[in-house]
Amino acid sequence: MGSFKDTFVVGAKGEADAMSIAAKAAELKAPIIVNGWNDLSADAIKLMDGKEIGIVGGSNNVSSQIENQLADIDKDRKVQRVEGETRHDTNAKVIETYYGKLDKLYIAKDGYGNNGMLVDALAAGPLAAGKGPILLAKTDITDSQKNALSKKLNLGAEVTQIGNGVELTVIQKIAKILGW
């Protein structure tokens, strides 16, 4: 798998969480480990041993039991969990936590109600690597996403929609943040 120093863990039902961190993981060449509910496989533990480990998603997707397991193998013996109340809030927290000022933003469907609709976000991960995060939205952006973008987006930032299904209101709200 090559050399890497970071890993990210998401829950088995945390597809949107995985898409939120996909661009950063691709940039860092870091694997995204999808865990089972109660424990991690021996292979996953071996792969992550001594690495910097980040959890993306709440305890409904990655249990505190797994978080404790991860702390035992993390390089610094501490694991950072990035979570929000919803997939959109977690997406905003990923942007706030893992990105500085942004000159590029990618937008893809959020998959809400149908995780199969996250296919555009999946395709965007390698494209966005090292350039900017993926904002997950469909009909609107949440207050947490708006706040994160207001803090992070540089005026004049380039915004790219990946695929169809993101409503014009999302683009209009981002344009307003950018002063367009």
Model-found features: residue ranges?
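Extracellular glycan-binding segments that recognize GlcNAc-based cell-wall polysaccharides
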Residues: M1-W180
